[in-house]
From Swiss-Prot:
Organism in which the protein naturally occurs: Pestalotiopsis fici (strain W106-1 / CGMCC3.15140)
Signal peptide limits: none
Protein known as: Oxidoreductase ptaF
Keywords carried by this UniProt record: Monooxygenase, Oxidoreductase
Induction: The cluster is expressed in rice fermentation medium. Three regulators are located in the cluster (ptaR1, ptaR2 and ptaR3), suggesting that the production of pestheic acid is controlled by a complex regulatory mechanism.
Transmembrane segments: none
Encoding gene, per UniProt annotation: ptaF
Length: 261
């Protein structure tokens, strides 16, 4: 039986991953989060489903993280933020924590290593974003500049470990809290907006590809049965993000949690 570790299991992507796994397979889920009550409120079925084991802690809690990753075939790195936080290190700290734990496992002889799946963004990829109007992409890059810089550094960090650790870099476009319509993976294109449920299904498909076609690749997600609804929180998120970019000293006074709805 397969086992997945989902880091950031209370976020939109994390909950969508749990829902997809529990709906479609007998795979076990190791859900890593800081607030178990929140997870149980968002995905009530985790309370009674024997396939789910919850690990409560922060990414710096090495022992809890090690227990969460133990025996897993795949690790989904979904700890992220929609707030353009100056000096953001969420993705880097997550990746560093995972690498540290897996290095110890490797030294102790626990092989093979799980495959990592990093949630990133098409906006920072020149190929996947080639059809995005220049003005729009420029606005998007600035509205999440601190988050995107964190993701760029995280990708460099993980690619530096590719001789022993495989990562898939999932880079969707705009995301929406919406129903699942159907998806396809692409190495050349993205489609916006995509629902979190379709994104999650795409991440699972990529990690399970028997030929490893997506290993160490930048992977886009396209819709196959129509786009998701426009995420209503996006305009405010962009506006607040731009303020954080041009006047980072204002960030503590700006609204938070303004991401997709």
């Amino acid at each position: 039986m397969s086992r997945y570790a989902i880091l950031g299991s209370t976020g939109n992507c994390g909950t969508a991953l749990i829902e997809n796994v529990l709906d479609s397979s007998m795979t076990e889920v190791h859900a890593f989060c800081r607030n178990q009550e929140k997870l149980e409120r968002l995905v009530p079925r985790v309370i009674s489903d024997a396939r789910v084991k919850v690990f409560v802690g922060g990414i710096g809690d090495t022992e809890t993280l090690a227990a969460c990753l133990h025996g897993c075939n795949a690790v989904f790195l979904c700890i992220t933020t929609n707030d353009n936080v100056p000096g953001c290190r969420v993705a880097q700290d997550t990746a560093l924590g995972v690498v540290k734990v897996l290095e110890r496992s490797r030294a102790d002889g626990f092989l093979p290593m799980p495959k990592l799946v990093l949630l990133s963004s098409a906006t920072i990829d020149d190929v996947l974003s080639r059809n995005t109007p220049w003005v729009l992409r420029s606005i998007l890059l600035k509205s999440a500049s601190h988050v995107y810089e964190d993701l760029r550094k995280t990708e460099i960090l993980l690619r530096a470990e590719q001789d022993w650790l495989t990562t898939i870099f999932i880079k969707p476009g705009a995301l929406s809290v919406d129903i699942q319509r159907g998806h396809a993976l692409s190495l050349t294109d993205e489609d916006s907006p995509v629902s979190y449920l379709d994104l999650a299904a795409a991440m699972i498909e990529a990690v399970n590809d028997p030929q490893g076609r997506y290993d160490m690749r930048n992977v886009g997600v396209v819709n196959t049965h129509g786009r998701a609804n426009f995420p209503s929180g996006t305009p405010l998120c962009i506006a607040v993000g731009l303020l954080s970019h041009f006047a980072p000293f204002l960030h503590p006074y700006l609204p938070s949690g303004t991401g997709p709805r």
